[in-house]
Amino acid sequence: MIPVVALVGRPNVGKSTLFNRLTRTRDALVADFPGLTRDRKYGRAFLSGYEFIVVDTGGIDGTEEGIETKMAEQSLAAIEEADVVLFMTDARAGLTAADLSIAQHLRSREKTTFVVANKVDGIDADSACAEFWSLGLGEVYQMAASQGRGVTNMIEYALTPYAEAMGIVRQGEDEVTEEREYTEEEAEAEQKRLQDLPIKLAIIGKPNVGKSTLTNRILGEERVVVFDEPGTTRDSIYIPMEREGREYVIIDTAGVRRRSKVHQVIEKFSVIKTLKAVEDANVVLLIIDAREGIAEQDLGLLGFALNAGRALVIAVNKWDGIDQGIKDRVKSELDRRLGFIDFARIHFISALHGTGVGHLFESIEEAYDSATRRVSTSMLTRIMQMSQDDHQPPLVNGRRVKLKYAHAGGYNPPIVVIHGNQVSRLPDSYKRYMMNYFRRSLKVVGTPIQLRFQEGDNPFENKTEKLTMSQERRRKRAQSHIKDRKTK
C-alpha cells in the first residue's frame, strides 16, 4: 500500500515549497494534455527509495475557530487519512500561538508526527530550533526546503519505520526509472499474465454523482460473489464479481451501501481514497453529473487518472429526466472541454434506472484490451517509419533528427520506446503527432499512449583514435625531426 504523507502547518512555513520539491519529478506527467486542470494539493513522489502520496494541507491557520469549526474540512480529512504527518514550522519566525494550537490538535489525533523546523539556512539552527521541543511531539528535524537541505533525510526518518511495519520493500532509483526492454517471448508472457488477471475497475467521481447507486446497480445485476465487507474510512472496498465469464474487481471509493441505505444521498468524499484507487486500478470509470456539467473537480479527478496512465471510460450519469436543450448543452461542453481525451469512450447513463449501464462493460473491456495488447518490435518500428515518411522530423542545428527503431516498454498504459539521434530535441508538437499516429495505427481505444525517447550513446565520444605501430613510429620520427629543427 502506498503511504500518504501530509504536510501540516500554518501559512508561509514552506509547505508548498516542500511539496513542489517532492513532486517535481511527477509534475509534468500530464503536460501532453493541454487544458487539464491539476490539483496542486495532491501529488505523487519518489524519494529515498519510497514512493508515496504527498498532501499539502493548506488552509489550516491554527486559530481556535479554525481548529474547532469548519476549518478546511478536506485538510483535516487528509490528516486523518495520512500515515505520516510532517508538522512544518518556521525556524526564523520562532514558535507562535498558531503552532501551539496545531500541535494540540495533532496530539489529540495520536498521529505519527514529525516536527520539521524549516528555513534554517543562514541562521544558528540549533538555537533557533530549541524552542520547538516544547510542542511535545518528539524530536525536531532541521530543513531548508528551498535549497533541498535535509529533505531526503527527513523522508527516510519519516517513512522507514512505517515501511518496515507494513512490509513495504524499499526500491532503488533504477527500479523506478528504468525502462524495461522486453524480448518477444517476455512480452508475450507479460501480456498473457495481464489478460488472465481480473480487471480492476475504479469508480470515481465527485460527491453525489451516483457512484454508490451505480455500484449497487452493477452488483445487483451481476450477483456479487463476495458482498462488501466493512472498510475503514481511508480504504476503498474491493468487490470481486464476474460478468459474462470475465472476472472483475470493483474498487468502490464511496462505500457500497446495503440495500436499506441506498436512499442516502450524502457521501464522504476523500481525494486520498480516490488517488489510492486510481493507482491500484487497471481501468478508471469517471462519473460526471449531467445536471451540473463538467466541474473543476471532475477535471482534477481526470488528472489523477491521466497521471497514473490508466485506461479510462467516462459515464455521464442522471441522463434521464432532463430536456433535450440541456442534453445538447452537455454534449457541446464535453466536446469543448474534454477534446484532449478523444481516445476515451463517453456513455450517457442512468444508474438509478439502469439505462445504458450494461454497455459500460463493453468499453471497459475494450479499454483494458487496448492497454494490455502486445505489439511486436517490428510492427512498432514499421509504424514509426511510416510516421516519418508522412511527416519528417525537423532539423536540429542543420541535421535531421533520425529515428532508428521502436519497441514496447510496458503495458497499462502502453509504452512505446523510440531510439534515435537527437531525439531529446524533438519539439512537443512532433511528439504529439507521433503519439496520435501510433494511436490511429494501432487502433487504441480507451487508454493513453506514452512515448519515451532514448538516444544511443556514441561509442567514439571522448575517445582518442588508437594508432597502429607503423603510425606510431612515423609520429615519433616527425616529432624528433621537428625537435632537431628547433635546436639548430
Swiss-Prot record:
Belongs to the TRAFAC class TrmE-Era-EngA-EngB-Septin-like GTPase superfamily. EngA (Der) GTPase family. PANTHER family: GTPASE DER (PTHR43834:SF6). This is GTPase Der. Residues 473-488 have a biased composition (Basic residues). Signal peptide: none annotated. Keywords: GTP-binding, Nucleotide-binding, Repeat, Ribosome biogenesis. InterPro entries: G_ENGA, GTP-bd, GTPase_Der, KH_dom-like, KH_dom-like_a/b, P-loop_NTPase, Small_GTP-bd. GTP 2 binds at residues 205-212, 252-256, 317-320. Residues 460-488 are annotated as: Disordered. It comes from Shewanella baltica (strain OS185). Residues 3-166, 199-372 form the EngA-type G domain. The gene is der. GO terms for molecular function: GTP binding; ribosome binding.
